[in-house]
Amino acid sequence: MAKAKFERLKPHVNVGTIGHVDHGKTTLTAAIATVAAITSGGEAKDYASIDSAPEEKARGITINTSHVEYDTPSRHYAHVDCPGHADYVKNMITGAAQMDGAILVVSATDGPMPQTREHILLSRQVGVPYIVVFMNKCDVVDDEELLELVEMEVRELLSDYDFPGDDTPIIHGSATEALKGSQEKYGQPAVVELLNVLDTYIPEPERDIDKAFLMPIEDVFSISGRGTVVTGRVESGIVRVGDEIEIVGIRDTQKTTCTGVEMFRKLLDEGRAGENCGVLLRGTKREDVQRGQVLAKPGSITPHTKFDAEVYVLSKEEGGRHTPFLNGYRPQFYFRTTDVTGAIQLQDGTEMVMPGDNVEMGVELIHPIAMDKGLRFAIREGGRTVGAGVVANVLN
């Protein structure tokens, strides 16, 4: 079977459903795919095919995730849906499925529940920039005032976590009715409205190539007569011959100039996001650069030792620790291409962290690493992964 050609004609946006168990995330995912297939072509998906989420691995952690694609007239969407709460936690922390926006599903019969709150908090911590709300099961609520009450609660909850609760689009509907093909206001028209809201409320994400240049250094070579070459995969932006660049992390930041870009032994004028290349550095000695540092556009990223993080700790069954860890625990933190030792500061009131938990913590590294909010890392102990995390706030 030939692979379908990926058409890059429309902007591509990543979204996902979040919310409490049994509030209708998977049913809504099926309804969106079905309605989008009717309005813009594409493949309708039924509940069963989305619910049987295949396993995948991200940073050594097994996660069950369903990927669904659909189109609106102006955009192409990739949508993730997870079967269980633990899968959401892992997915969001590892960044296995980075979301440009999330669809929060809240049952009108229950209102916000504990996982509703937790998913909003996680969205804030891991940097999901936009949330839209689908109030589900509205067809079984007779009392209009109750719907207004639930909507108010949801808006307050969003505002509690620094999302613009008052301005967030909230759509009332019924995923089940939409899947049945109902043309009543809570049926397919509500899902059409949701698709319009996704198009208008979630801005088009900035492409990696349009961001500032950043390349994690994987290897360093010395080429006689030409100088020092560092190799790696360009994470974002473009580096051109003649550009001033900084070497950031582990040691004091150094300035240098790119005097050449090589790929597959060919000389190029530039290296772009997604490409593996070698960058020739003017006047930089081989011993001044090491794996774990990054090349970056001057001033675009700074090195830090202290940060707050949201962390998922692997369970024993996932190959993680068998015992909890306490305050002051000192594992290795694996950022991009290297391990750095760091000490953990648990929040007041948290005595220990059990395998399988997700937790907020402070970290202090022994060497500074180039980092920004949203950077993912693994926590390792003797070479095996025991956790995954994301930088929630950079401190110093």
From Swiss-Prot:
GTP binds at residues 19-26, 81-85, 136-139. Its main location: cytoplasm. It catalyses: GTP + H2O = GDP + phosphate + H(+). Mg(2+) binds at residue 26. One of its GO terms (molecular function) is guanosine tetraphosphate binding. Keywords: Cytoplasm, Elongation factor, GTP-binding, Hydrolase, Magnesium, Metal-binding, Nucleotide-binding, Protein biosynthesis. It is found in: Cytoplasm. NCBIfam families: EF-Tu, PRK00049.1, PRK12735.1, PRK12736.1, small_GTP. This is Elongation factor Tu. It comes from Psychrobacter cryohalolentis (strain ATCC BAA-1226 / DSM 17306 / VKM B-2378 / K5). The gene is tuf1.
